[in-house]
Every structure is written in C-alpha cells, then in structure tokens.
Design a protein with these regions (language model features):
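Family-specific signature for flavin-dependent thymidylate synthase
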Residues: 1-259
C-alpha cells in the first residue's frame, strides 16, 4: 500500500520565495526584505510572480517526501524528473526476504487475473531466494578457498549474491525512497503526472504529494495540478474530455486544504 509523507520543507517557503524575487528589483538588505513581508504582501507578490511567469525564485523552496509501498515501475518513471534528489532502497544491499509487491487495480478487479498474478509473484519470490542462496553458497566456498574466514566470507558473499539475484525480480516489486524537489520542479511534476493520461500509480503519487504541499504553500501551488487546471488541455486528440471534472476535483482539494 502506497504511503506518502512530507517529512521536511523550507521554513516559510512562500516568504523565502517572495523575498528572493523581491531582491531582484530592490537594493534593500535581505533581512529587511524578509522583515517587510507579511502574509498579505507575500501572497500579492507570489501572485504577481505567477502572472509574470517569473519562475526561478520558486526554486528556493524545497520539499522532501518519504515514499513507501510503490513499485519499481514507478521508480523508473519518477527518476525521469531529473531536477530532484532520490535516495532509494538498494536491492544490492537489502535482501528481500519479505517479498512485497504492488497489485495494479485492473488486475485486482479481475479474480482470475489476480490469482494468476499472485501465483507469478510467489514463484518470482521463490526463484529469487533460491538463486540468492545458491549464489551465496558458491561465493562463500570460493572466498573461503582463497583463505577468507567463514564469517567474513559469508558477509561478502551475501552482498555479491544480492547483486545478481535481483535480476529475476519483477517490476511489481515494492520499493521505498526519499525524494526532494524544489517547488518549480514540483509544479512541472504535477503538470505532467496529475494528468489522467499519466500511468495510474505515479498519478496517485502525484496527487498525494500535491495534497501535502498545497496547505504549506497555497500561493506557490495555486495553479498546480494537471495542465488543464490552469489552461487548455495540451494533449490534443488524446485529451480525456473531462476538463470540467478535473478542475472541479482540484478545486475541491484546494478548498478542503483551506478549511
């Protein structure tokens, strides 16, 4: 099951962004700029930035998420967003004795497909652990023959075994990560991944991340969400045709966060 937490962010992110942007047009000291910003002035300045398309100051605010219960399929997608920092559970150093996996909703909804999927996952887990064991025994024997003490040999052999045994693991295999993005990167991430055409799992993640950051920085993320929230759908013939519904959905999310 996917879980997402906002574990850290820039203190007073909107005030920091407003001060950074204000500095571009002022000869005042930074401390004076910060002290001169109340909530109303900050909101006004951020709205002006958005209207002008002056986005670089937004990069001064960053947000760090703890993400668990997602698949390696999602990992391959989220790391395409290159202006971000990722720390991911290693399949090289962590042996997956407790093999967990993500079941896609469309498979979950069809009993026969779900049964076949679970059977496949169980077989994959068995093959993975069997291969890891065989590799570990083989590496241990070789290292001990080379004169390494057994305890040290087994520790080294275990890591070597994990490195190659992971090749049989499926994309459904669960992983966990810590991800940090600046606000501008998040705006782009939401623009692309909250869209109904995004793959279901990363769309679910993007929506959860949006729900977490919006209450912290509502003016920065006022126009965030899929592209159609703040303008016409850019998908052309591939448009889902549900722009009004999507806008209503994100309006409700923002309204709920403001309560």
């Amino acid at each position: 099951m996917m879980t997402v937490r906002l574990i850290a962010h820039t203190p007073e992110p909107e005030k920091v962004v407003a001060a950074a942007a204000n500095l571009c047009y002022s000869d005042a000291h930074i401390t004076d700029l910060l002290d001169g910003l109340d909530e109303e002035k900050t909101a006004k300045f951020l709205t002006m930035l958005s209207d002008l398309g002056h986005a670089s100051p937004i990069e001064h605010a960053s947000f760090t998420f703890g993400i668990e219960g997602v698949s390696r399929t999602l990992l391959a997608q989220i790391t395409r967003h290159r202006i971000a920092s990722f720390s991911v559970q290693s399949q090289r150093y962590v042996r997956l004795d407790d093999f967990r996996y993500v079941v896609p909703p469309e498979i979950e909804a069809i009993p026969e497909a779900k049964a076949a999927f679970i059977e496949s996952m169980n077989e994959d887990a068995k093959r993975y652990l069997d291969l890891a064991h065989k590799l570990e025994e083989g590496h241990t024997a070789r290292l001990m023959a080379e004169g390494m003490p057994e305890k040290q040999a087994r520790a080294k052999a275990g890591k070597q075994a994990n490195e190659d045994a992971r090749f049989v693991l499926p994309n459904a295999c669960e992983t966990k990560m810590v991800v940090t993005m600046n606000a501008r990167s998040l705006q782009n991430f939401f623009h692309l991944r909250c869209c109904s055409r995004a793959q279901w799992e990363i769309r679910q993640l993007a929506e959860e991340m949006f729900k977490l950051v919006y209450p912290v920085a509502p003016h920065i993320f006022a126009k965030s969400g899929p592209a159609c929230v703040s303008g016409p759908c850019p998908e052309g013939k591939m448009c889902c045709g549900k722009t009004a519904e999507v806008r209503a959905k994100y309006a409700a999310i923002k309204e709920g966060a403001a309560v």
